[in-house]
UniProtKB/Swiss-Prot annotation:
This is Large ribosomal subunit protein uL10. Belongs to the universal ribosomal protein uL10 family. Pfam families: Ribosomal_L10. It comes from the Bacteria. Forms part of the ribosomal stalk, playing a central role in the interaction of the ribosome with GTP-bound translation factors. One of its GO terms (molecular function) is structural constituent of ribosome. PANTHER family: 39S RIBOSOMAL PROTEIN L10, MITOCHONDRIAL (PTHR11560). GO terms for cellular component: large ribosomal subunit.
Amino acid sequence: MGRTLENKKEIVADLKETLGESTLALVIEYQGLTVAEISDLRRRLRPSGTVCKVTKNTLMGIAIQDDEKWQPLSELLKGSSAFLLVKEDFSSAIKAYQDFQKVTKKTELRGGVMEGRLLKEPDVKALGDLPSKEQLMGQIAGAINALATKIAVGINEVPGGLARALQAVADKENGGDDSAA
């Protein structure tokens, strides 16, 4: 028994809502994966806030039809498609997919769309090589901390340097008095 029209409308509405929250959509060929393997992929993607949707290409086509941001996705809608809808941390999501692909070797990345731009496989791999959000925040925090430390050391050096200079002048004057006497 096929899906009812009402059911299809619900699926399209759900896809539109998920796409609205997403920054990146990846399309993979998933033919040959078992239910357990798809569940494993979803489990791996969950920590990065990524949703894996397996739906008909026509329903995804209807969902993106009125949204220019996702229009390029229509070029990737063919065959058995699974959609990885990434909300924020696309680097972690791509790495999670690549790890899954290394284990199963059953999927093929067709491409993706980010900010209205069609991404081919090399583009997606380049995005995956970027540091994750947490790593970037750590690097920024480290740089800020290092800057604050340098400022504190610099501020402490000014009075210390001044005190040493005054002491040197005082020693010179005292030493000069001793030799004159």
